[in-house]
């Protein structure tokens, strides 16, 4: 679905232009997360927004982007944000209907905590240039009452 017959790259980024409409973004993320390759399914998907509001950012986090970068932003800041996807652990959530970064990561302390509606897996992933994408831990979590 993503146009990759044979895929040998260890570390891939998907950089998404701000002109993608919502349906195109949903399709891209669905196809990416269900690509059948760990290198693709857990590749960082980074959306560039033009002067996005906090609501725009939250909406796109909920869609499943790993990061949202507002442009214009200087090149050094963009490089720092992209580098943050490499060499550190990231929490991904896997449910029957979603695979992607933890959508609760922007919840603020004191904010009403959302509850898991179904059993899901928490996957800790690590991306490095040397090893590509690795699933470091997988923990099944029951739904909260």
Annotate each predicted stretch with a short phrase:
Residues 1-41:
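Conserved phosphotransfer microenvironments
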Residues 17-25, 51-55, 75:
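Short acidic, S/G/P-rich loop/turn micro-motifs used as interaction or catalytic elements
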Residues 73-82:
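C-terminal output helix
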């Amino acid at each position: 679905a993503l146009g990759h017959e044979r895929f040998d790259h260890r570390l891939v980024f998907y950089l998404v232009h701000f002109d993608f409409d919502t349906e195109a973004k949903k399709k891209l993320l669905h196809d990416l997360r269900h690509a059948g390759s760990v290198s693709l399914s857990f590749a960082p998907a980074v959306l560039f927004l033009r002067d996005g509001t906090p609501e725009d950012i939250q909406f796109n986090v909920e869609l499943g982007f790993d990061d949202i970068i507002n442009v214009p932003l200087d090149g050094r800041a963009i490089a720092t944000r992209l580098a943050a996807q490499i060499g550190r652990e990231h929490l991904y959530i896997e449910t029957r209907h979603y695979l992607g970064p933890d959508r609760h990561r922007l919840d603020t302390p004191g904010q009403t905590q959302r509850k898991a509606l179904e059993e899901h897996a928490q996957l800790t992933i690590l991306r490095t240039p040397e090893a590509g994408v690795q699933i470091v831990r997988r923990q099944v979590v029951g739904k909260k009452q």
